Amino acid sequence: LTLLDTPGHVDFSAEMERVLQVLDYAVLLISGADGVQGHTQTLWSLLQQYEIPTFLFINKMDQPGADREALMAELKSRLSEGCIDFTHAQRMAAGGTAQDTTKKRIDADESDPQRKDTEAVELWYEELAACQEEALETYLETGSIPKEQIQDMIADRLVFPCYFGSALKMQGIEEFLNGFVDWTEPVQYPVEFSAKVYK
């Protein structure tokens, strides 16, 4: 795994765009305090232009006014409906099928934390299923979506995993790194030598 840190400031957009051309995946950092800004949308357009699968990390969630639900709504409306909260995706994916979780939710008392967990699993799968017709068919037939299919949806820029945290306080970093490893696929390149030269 090789990470390339690009300048985020608008003055270095040209240098950043050159780096985009060699990426397999991108991580777009967004301030939880400021939300989606004009430059964020510019970067998003470039990522779309170069067809780069993208993860989002919403930073500074420790600051006053950082509202997770409001930020998710903004990401969906200003960037893509495919922006989905993956913070607890590993646990979600291990939570069983929708039929399993529906039964647990019906059996559980309304005040039971397990009921909220099972509802979250259902909602997560429903959001994923809404991003692709094949995923919807799989979800309706089996009550879940295989990890490999979710990875393909991310690679095809149909789904954009979102993680939340605070780099300053080291919150959410481990969850993001684990998720990045879990939900990415190795890219196969031809054995012949090739390079891109630019000035």
Task: Identify the function of each model-found stretch.
Residues 1-199:
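Structural and coupling elements of P-loop NTPases
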